[in-house]
Amino acid sequence: MPDQPDSTTDGQPQPSLAARLRAARVAAGLTQQAAADALGVSRPLLVAIEKGARETRPEELLVLARLYGRSIHELARPAPPLEAFGTQFRAALAAAPEAGQLQGTVDELERLGDDYLELARLAGATLPRRYPAVTDITGLDPQQAAEDLASNERNRLGLGDGPVLSLRELLDEDVGVRVFAPQLPSHVAGAFVYAEPLGGTIAVNANHPYERQRWTLAHEYGHFLSSRNRSEVTVLRRWERVPAAERFADSFAAHFLMPRAGLHRRFHSLSRDRDGDVTAADLLQLAHSYRVSLQAMILRLEDLRLLPAGSFDRLRDLGFRPSEAEQLLGLPRPAPDQTLLPPRYRYLAAELYVRAEITEGQLARFLRLDRVNARRVVEELTGSQDVGPDGDVVPLRLAEGAR
């Protein structure tokens, strides 16, 4: 049930409230007439409320909050709402199969972004950004443009030419792209949108394998660098003719995750050690070190002409099973990253709870968890361990004031 409002207005219209009411209605898929009927007012009066020309009374706000499935706290936030993701995703969703399944995800992603901004506002924090200028690749060869941009971006971020180990943390902390991992339909790898004042936002499918998630992250980051104002939904499909933008993004992912110079050096070193006889097990270990799939690694080596074309197809036809080989080689199988929220988002929520600036119920809503698990997250983020005088490991609480 929505929170009870203390006082929604001081007799003056609130522009941010009016804008949030309109955005919530649109996200709920309701017409102005339907909302007016539920409120028991005329449509022109609802229009006046949404324009901020007429103040919203407390009892009206309660009705609209219930109708739109929002809390009073969401609707009464003093900041204007985030740019509507649904509007930006309209073209991308129109081209995607089963768009209806994705609309709910888009709406929830927008609410997560708005919650992120609210947490930052309450904490007095600034969400970091270190964005490069957009690179226009119009008219350029997609593969060459992708390699050039990937090389430039790795240099900008000081990555050298080795594997990128913690890609999500890199984008979140060093670049300031907000990365979420929601549950998506199996045929959807991820999505990208740019909306102020949040900035670049990427969603990756929490149910996909770890290597696929990293590829999707790099793919969407390529879109962010080259076409920031065009939202993208990446659907796994067989194209008759792959669009240039998708060829660019996939090529960017390959070059960013497996840069030419570093991979050349590692492969030639491996080849020398094996007297030129590189095995499937060697390739699997190489893929593991770069945290990509065996298929992605072999196709990249084919692209660099370090392996003959068709090597992956031949290996597959021979019945080679990467998962079984990983077990035999003792290579750990990385679990998918199913952490819905960015680290900074969770830290802000925990900090505000510890400082008693949000309630336990609000904490749970921000973290999308029940109260027990929300408190557990706070314990994990604000607690550590130390060694006591008797040599025993004891908890070290950094948040003794937490309720």
Where do the language-model regions lie?
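Short juxta-domain linker segments that transition from a proline/glycine-rich
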Residues: 1-403
